[in-house]
Amino acid sequence: MNATILVKIITPLSIALEKQAKMVTMSGEEGMFGVLPSHVPMIVSLKAGLVQVYIDDMHKSENTYLISSGVTEVTANYINIATETAINVTNFSEAEIATKLLDLQKTLSDQH
C-alpha cells in the first residue's frame, strides 16, 4: 500500500508536525484508534496520550508525540489534530514518556 494521508498536529503556538503518513494511531475518549488513507470523515475528541505516526513502515512508529486533550478532524486525505500541548517524544524511553504523561495529566487536572 503506497497511499498516504497528510497529518498535522497543531498547537496554539505552532504546527508541531506536518507529514505524509501511512497510518496514525491516537487515544480517543472511547479508546485507541487508527487512521489509514481514505478513512471515512469523522471528528473525535482526544484524551491526553500518544499520537504515533507511521511514515514508511506500518509496523514501526517513526514519530511519536505526547499530546494534551484535543480534537481531531479526519477526512480521506488528511488528519488535523488540534491540541494545547504537543511534545515530540520520538527518542524518549518508555519510562521518560510515562513520566511526561503523568506530568501532563497532573497539569491538566490542576487546571480544572
Curated annotation (Swiss-Prot):
Protein name in UniProt: ATP synthase epsilon chain
HAMAP family: ATP_synth_epsil_bac (MF_00530)
Family: Belongs to the ATPase epsilon chain family.
Functional description taken from the UniProt entry: Produces ATP from ADP in the presence of a proton gradient across the membrane.
Membrane topology according to the record: Peripheral membrane protein
UniProt keyword Cell cycle present: no
Higher taxonomy: Bacteria, Pseudomonadati, Pseudomonadota, Alphaproteobacteria, Rickettsiales
Pfam families tied to this protein: ATP-synt_DE_N (PF02823)
Keywords: ATP synthesis, Cell membrane, CF(1), Hydrogen ion transport, Ion transport, Membrane, Transport
Subunit structure, as described in the record: F-type ATPases have 2 components, CF(1) - the catalytic core - and CF(0) - the membrane proton channel. CF(1) has five subunits: alpha(3), beta(3), gamma(1), delta(1), epsilon(1). CF(0) has three main subunits: a, b and c.
Annotated GO CC locations: plasma membrane; proton-transporting ATP synthase complex
Encoding gene (name): atpC
Superkingdom as given in the UniProt entry: Bacteria
Compartment(s) of residence: Cell membrane
Transcription regulation recorded as keyword: no
Species annotation: Rickettsia africae (strain ESF-5)
GO molecular function: ATP binding; proton-transporting ATP synthase activity, rotational mechanism
